[in-house]
Amino acid sequence: MFDGRNSGHSSFSSRGDGMHTPEHELAGHAAPSTRRGKQNRRSDMEVMKERFAKLLLGEDMSGGGTGETSALALSNAITKLADSMFGEQMKLQPMYPETKENWRKEMGWLLSVIDHIVQFVPSRQMGKNGQFTEIMVTKQRDDLLTNIPALRKLDSVLLETLDNFKDQKDFWYVPRDMEDADHNGDWRRDENWWLPVVKVPTDGLSEESRRWLQNQKDSVAQVLKAATAINAHVLSEMHVPENYIDSLPKNGKTSLGDFLYKSITEESFDPDYFVSFLDLSTEHKVLDLKNRIEASMVIWKRKMCQKEKDGKSQWGSTVSLEKRELFEVRAETILVMLKQQFPGIPQSSLEVSKIKNNKDVGQAILESYSRVLESLASKIMSRIEDVLEADRLVQRQLMGEAETRSESEAESEYEETEKVVAAETPNSRKLSDFIGWRLSSDTKKHSSMSDIEFFHKVEQEKEKPMMKSPRALPKKFSYLAKLENMRSPSDRH
Amino acid sequence: MESSSNSDQNEGTPTSSVSSPYRRTYSDISGLSHRFDVQSFYNRPSNTNAVVLSGHEEDVSEDAEEPKDDVVNDVHGDGDEEDSDIDSAEDAELEMMRERFAKLLLGEDMSGSGKGVCTAVTVSNSITNLYATVFGQSLRLQPLSTEKKDLWKREMNCFMSICDYIVEVIPRSLGTNVEITETKLRSDILMSLPALRKLDNMLMEILDSFTENEFWYVERGSSSMNSGGGGRDSGTFRKVVVQRKDEKWWLPVPCVPAEGLSEEERKHLRHKRDCASQIHKAALAINDSTLNDMDIPDSYLTTLPKSGKASVGDVIYKQLCTAEKFYPDQLLDILKITSEHEALELADKVEASLVTWRRKTGGLTHSKSSWDMMKDISGDADRGNDKNHILAARARSLLFCLKQRYPELSQTSLDICKIQFNRDVGKAVLESYSRVLEGLAYNVVSWIDDVLYVDRTVRNRDD
């Protein structure tokens, strides 16, 4: 029995080897072109052996087989590698060359696993007699074929952005203790206590510099959007683990709590009005809300599937099928809004559970790689935002000192600036994010209903521009700053 | 009298089959299309003295070489090595190792969806498959080709390097009041892996020693065999081709000069045979030890019948029960086992009974390892009167005797089950490595015995 089994594996493996050709070697994937000494080469070999050996053991040093699956081991390895490479990146400056080289090399090793994840597809081959014959050839799995090059590209863009800050003179950093000594007081938020303080010239940034920084920020924002979209898509593709389902209460009402359940199940439902009444004062509360909503969505989905499967009469249920579907759409709408408003929120229980129980190696790599790029992009955006904020502070001081300007004129100009910022950023982000999110929706019907909700929300937004902006901005800054900690499933730490 | 006795003993050995890992290469061997060089054979100079025939040895493995190996070969062929060549070779090595590791992580599942086998089984299968790739077409007493040897060393180093990171944490005292913990290589790996490496090297050296042989090989079915036979009658040729037994139809036929081998060659062959035999015993011991240390899988336990008697059958059960003293050798003689297949069937039954009786005594808790089981049997002298204890002890001695009598027995059902369900990576490496070395050593012994057999046949015929 064992012999036969081995034979099968052997022949299958051999055939796969023969057919597969690595087609997706990218520049970052190749060996370093510069010649290096024998010493370094041997060191590469030893480091790679250690990395892979520990992956194979699933991080279980005893070798007893109680370690994690390959999928989870790879996911953790990518997360830890990113943390060790970027954890110390607190300034807008290029990475150290050695650090960058290590990142490319070790990610190259980890990503090389996907070169061997393939599927068989039919292909036509010209025989010797001129006749076509259909044979099976190997091709890289579709989701990897699409997303890995994209993630590699996003990776390059982020590193290039940091490289762009080489030799810049417009701003600089001083350690926090020096800053405290100068001012005898801290105007910075407490959340950033460990960051060095960014300084700009006493007359502020030049208009050119300001424009250039904004340009860099926009570029990184695009990367963040793309990485977030890929991460969300991969997570949605992962199976909901059985142990997560087993831990759920029996109905959505229990999960949401009375207040939320009543609000969502009202005849008329206004998501903006609903969100305005929620207590979103701490990260923990937002995460808890996210967990509850996701749990109720899973419960409702499962009940709908069961109902369709059983062929049970609608009238026999407490809540009809259509209503439950409506509730699910509303819950999803709120979830999307939360994710827009708090992009740095830690992963929900469902997401953590999916990652920990996932066994698909390809998905593990896609999810972890997109997540670490998402974190890096957010971090860079925060750093750029710090510089722009320092500049705005100086500008405000300058305006206050100007004798020739009237008080009302200055305030008026400030208000206009605030309006422009408030009007532009939330709108553009929400619009594109919302549309992007829809693409991963399960059914067309959901999309259709969500579109209606979406247009309704836009109308609401136009009517109340002033109410929204003062509340959104401070919280956004607050939570963006928390991205200093690399995002990863909380249970893992 | 004495020579007759030796003849009987040696004739028995060639009838044994090769080890189980080796059998997987049948299909590869049947595909061989190499033919003996007839022209070269006929043109051989005729003289009364023995002539070294190394030129006639064909390296059947050459066609199986992969393009990758050429890079390594080029480097080894260069007398003056340049830095660029070294860099190129080492880059290639790094790349190959990376590919090997990547595939191990996927657990033989190319879809990457996580349906592959666990790491331990993956490593075990990989070592077994590597052995088949490197040694599968090695059917003669001759050195392994450089490419195959390098492939074997490189890939085995890759697999064994995983064991470098399997450790256990132990406390160590730095003084009266200071104690720290440090990591140490796991004890079974620390002991057995260097031993296996040593056995591996010794086997390579034995094969390397067969470079200027007095004997040579012809392929079975070769036209030269018939011609040779005819030639003898006509008096044109003095070489004799001895027909071998059919049991090893796939092996090439060894040939010796008409007057037999020289005493020196004979001595050399016997010495190498003894070495290979010792290696076989050592590898077998390590393999048995590792298998015994593996837990008995639940899936095996659930398939056992309720009584040990049902497994082993009435005849054997009666023998185990009634005899005042139990002599396993005598029982095996009585049973008149005629084939290895029968021996394996008996081993499976006895082993199943052993586990069943052990469970009944309460000594076998959930998935207890066989070692603990063995210790319980020998340790519980006070409960020697218990029937199940006696039965278990006797079953164990019978199984042991059976394995001694048939050293190349295939794996029992329990062995196979343990290997398939094992999750321990270190044990997977030790078990598979010792098993393939065991198979190779046994093959070397068999091949040497074949040559000695032909030699004796030729000399007896002359007398």
From Swiss-Prot, chain A:
Pfam families: PRONE (PF03759)
Any one GO cellular component localisation term in the record: apical plasma membrane
Region (Disordered): 1-45, 400-423
Basic and acidic residues composition-biased segments: 17-27
InterPro entries, A to Z: PRONE_dom, RopGEF
Keyword terms, alphabetized: Guanine-nucleotide releasing factor
Domain spans labelled PRONE: 35-401
PROSITE patterns xrefs: PRONE
Organism superkingdom: Eukaryota
Function of the molecule: Guanine-nucleotide exchange factor (GEF) that acts as an activator of Rop (Rho of plants) GTPases by promoting the exchange of GDP for GTP.
Domain notes: The PRONE (plant-specific Rop nucleotide exchanger) domain is responsible for the GEF activity.
Protein name, UniProt field: Rop guanine nucleotide exchange factor 10
Source organism (scientific name): Arabidopsis thaliana
Gene name, Swiss-Prot/TrEMBL: ROPGEF10
UniProtKB/Swiss-Prot annotation, chain B:
Any one Gene Ontology cellular component term annotated for this protein: secondary cell wall
Task performed by this protein: Guanine-nucleotide exchange factor (GEF) that acts as an activator of Rop (Rho of plants) GTPases by promoting the exchange of GDP for GTP. In association with ROPGEF1, acts as a specific regulator of ARAC10/ROP11 function in ABA-mediated stomatal closure.
More details: Plants overexpressing ROPGEF1 or ROPGEF4 are relatively insensitive to ABA-induced stomatal closure and become severely wilted during drought stress. A similar phenotype is observed in plants expressing a constitutively active ARAC10/ROP11.
Native organism: Arabidopsis thaliana (Mouse-ear cress)
Subunit structure: Interacts with ARAC10/ROP11.
Keywords: Cell membrane, Cytoplasm, Guanine-nucleotide releasing factor, Membrane, Stress response
Name of the featured protein: Rop guanine nucleotide exchange factor 4
Biased composition (Basic and acidic residues): 69-78
Disordered: annotated segments: 1-25, 55-87
Consequences of knocking out this gene: No visible phenotype under normal growth conditions, but mutant plant roots have reduced density of secondary wall pits in metaxylem vessels.
Domain PRONE as annotated: residue spans: 84-463
A GO molecular function held by the record: guanyl-nucleotide exchange factor activity
Compartments reported by the entry: Cytoplasm; Cell membrane
Keyword Flavoprotein annotated: no
Location, primary (coarse class): cytoplasm
Domain commentary: The PRONE (plant-specific Rop nucleotide exchanger) domain is responsible for the GEF activity.
InterPro entries: PRONE_dom, RopGEF
Gene that this polypeptide is encoded by: ROPGEF4
Expressed in which tissues: Expressed in root vascular tissue and trichoblast cell files. Expressed in root metaxylem cell files. Expressed in guard cells of cotyledons, rosette leaves, sepals, petal, stigmas and siliques. Expressed in root metaxylem cell files.
Keyword Cell membrane: yes
